Amino acid sequence: NDLLYCVQVLLKRVPGALALAVTVMGTILAAMTGIIGASVTMMTALALPTMMRQGYSHAMSCGVIAASGTLGILIPPSIMLIIMADLMAISVGNVFMAAVTPGLTLAAFYLIYVATISAAKPSLAPPLPEHLLNVPKGEMGPLIAKSFLPPVFLITLIKGSILLGWATPSEAGAVGAFGATLLAIFNGRLKDGTLVEVCNTSAKTVSMIFFIVISATCFAYVYRSLGGDDVVEHLIVEKAGLDAWGMLILIMAIVFFLGFFLDWLEITLIVL
């Protein structure tokens, strides 16, 4: 809430300030959580009611939340990047560094699109209320510090420990959990039963991921042992006569098609 409010105030003179604030918040949450479900759920609970109250169109509101909320799949420390690095036997740090630019570029395109469509069609993104347009300048410093320092601290703690080689991804996850706990204590939001609920949710998520990993690995081993990959390679390379670029375009089209009915984890484990 503090972050969303702060970014709205900072962008108050820009068309579509609230939608831009939601996109910025989605980018920051992506760099903090590394998982889509957490970002989309949190943004829907925080941002959607606010956008509805301010008169944003349903299509605009849902589109902004869905697009910016899914940045967690690409911006480090994405769980998908960690699994991809393990499957391809590549350093997680290198994969993280390679994904930073595409992730931030996509976020920048979202911001440009939202600002453009808000300026072209003001009815989709009404101006901010008066109380947000008249925030005293003296309140901006403490507001920015309170809103941005905690996420910057957590992002630096997680990514810095990995990129500098101080911790493995698993250890960095523990560091991030410790940092998030400290922030919750500092903000007075660590209540009775919170840690138990977090541990239960984490255990369920990890169990589901491992079940999918085991199932997909068994499928891949059986498929390859029966010569399925050789058949596909023969059809694509020899029959279709595709070069490297043609192969890349075909694979991207297949992944795009699979995305309609499979989650990222299943696609990653099957395709790679």
Positions of PLM-derived features:
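Alpha-helical transmembrane segments of multi-pass membrane transport proteins
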Residues: 1-272
